[in-house]
C-alpha cells in the first residue's frame, strides 16, 4: 500500500501489529488472510544452531480456521534495504512500556518488505509462543532469507520488549 496504517501494541515480550486492509495470499491453493504480525527478540527458531536478533511471525487464517505462521529471521545489519526501512518506520514509534494499541501511520510500508523470495522450511507443529499448544502450518525462512534491521532499531526493540525465554524445541507435528 502506498499509504498504510498499523495498530501496534507493546505486549511486553513481543510487538503485536494489526495491519489495515485485507491482506490475502495463497497457501496450497487456498486463500489465507493475515490476522496479525508479531515481532519477538531474539528468534524462536535456531539458524545454524543459534538464535537470530529477532523473528517476525506473520499469522494467517483460512476460511476453515486453519492457521499458517510465516516466520522470518531478522539480523542486525545497518543499511537501506526494504526491510531496514520497514522496521525504521515502526520501531521508533512504539511506546516504551506495555501499552494500549497505538495507530501508526506509515508511508510506503508493506509486509512484502520483510517476506523474502527465498527457500523455506515447512512443518506442522504447535505454536512457538504461549500457550505453545494448538496446531499450525509453519513456514520458516532460512537465514539466507533473513530480513535486516538497523542496529539502532534493534537496540530500541531490545529496550521495548523482553527477550523470549528459549526452551527446548516444541514437538513437531505431534511426534
Feature map (PLM): residue ranges:
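Alpha-carbonic anhydrase
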Residues: 1-175
Amino acid at each position: 500500500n502506498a499509504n498504510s496504517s498499523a495498530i501496534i501494541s507493546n505486549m511486553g515480550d513481543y510487538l503485536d501489529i494489526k495491519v489495515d486492509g485485507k491482506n490475502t495470499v495463497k497457501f496450497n491453493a487456498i486463500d489465507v488472510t493475515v490476522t496479525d504480525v508479531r515481532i519477538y527478540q531474539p528468534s524462536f527458531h535456531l539458524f545454524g544452531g543459534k538464535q537470530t536478533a529477532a523473528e517476525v511471525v506473520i499469522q494467517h487464517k483460512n476460511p476453515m480456521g486453519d492457521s499458517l505462521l510465516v516466520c522470518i529471521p531478522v539480523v542486525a545489519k545497518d543499511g537501506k534495504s526494504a526491510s531496514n526501512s520497514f522496521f525504521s518506520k515502526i520501531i521508533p514509534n512504539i511506546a516504551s512500556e506495555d501499552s494500549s494499541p497505538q495507530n501508526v501511520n506509515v508511508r510506503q510500508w508493506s509486509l512484502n518488505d520483510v517476506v523474502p523470495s527465498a527457500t523455506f522450511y515447512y512443518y506442522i507443529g504447535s505454536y512457538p509462543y504461549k500457550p505453545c499448544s494448538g496446531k499450525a502450518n509453519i513456514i520458516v525462512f532460512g537465514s539466507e532469507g533473513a530480513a535486516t534491521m538497523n542496529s539502532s532499531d534493534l537496540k530500541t526493540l531490545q529496550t521495548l520488549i523482553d527477550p523470549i525465554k528459549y526452551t527446548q524445541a516444541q514437538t513437531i507435528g505431534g511426534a
